[in-house]
Amino acid sequence: MMNNKIGCILLNIGTPDQPTVPSIRKYLKEFLSDPDVIDSSKIIRWMIVNLIVSPFRPKRILHQYESIWTKDGSPLLANSKEFSLNLSRLLPEFNIEIGMRYGNPSILKAVKNLKNLGINDILLIPMFPQYAQATSGSCIQAAKEIIKEEIPACKIKVIEKFYSEDFYIKCLVEKILNSSEYKECEYLLFSFHGLPERQIKRLDKSRQHCLVKNKCCEEICDSNINCYKAHCTQTVNKVVEQLKPSVEYSICFQSRFGLDKWISPNITDVMVSLSNKGIKKVAVACPSFTFDCLETLEEIAIRNNETFVEELNGEYLKLIPSLNNENYWVKNFSEFIKRSI
């Protein structure tokens, strides 16, 4: 039986099921086997995943997951579930599902749930404001393939990005302004997840703009319309325009791994620079993460704070929490969905 409601799948990267070595290993193997994530040749990717990462990394990072795990499980999944539930209350005309690219609940499970309800119209929304092939692109492609297999006649609509949408910018500004971390800091850092430079250059069809031209990210044009770094830059520019920060600020990138050259400046280099300038109190906003997760709660709030305090003579480096389930964020996001149909 056909359902007149619209299906909506909130897409995200995913999380291990448990803070255990086997669970982390399973998740990492699935995550890093994606050619959009490690975009090397198939044999090199296999060697990296199975000979370098899988045997050793799960044990090394187990304590990181243990340090952020809650009674409700993974913070990313718990926040996603609460957000989905709150969104559903505001959007009774939609059936909303969570679909993780890797791990559970999977995109396949989300699609099958909608199929069983007789849904024939699905809206895909990656919960990444700034577009990157390794995140939004991979999620969208996987979801489209699964939908075509499970519901061949389904109409699909996609929201690829929302990095400069007014509702998103206003929510970020409100979150920062109301945070004690910002009110007490001497410096505001905007930290985004990093990417290898080659992934940025690959989406520049002109091959002559991204990371080639001076100030290549300052304005959006045909060459950088899908450039992740340009999206991050535009997000910060728009936030700062409304925020009118009372302290100095800058942008940086985090979560670098491997030997490839990644987009810069890297957060570790920025922390050293701030220390050399005598800055002691730093607040960090992470606009690329709509939900708090390992990269915010452990990498920023624990690991980078410890480095800044213990090695760089800082007083603190504090995380400004992500938007998560703030009422104004849920409400504005629901209205954004309505406008997008």
What are these regions (language model features)?
Residues 2-341:
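Active-site-proximal alpha-helix that buttresses catalytic centers in soluble enzyme cores
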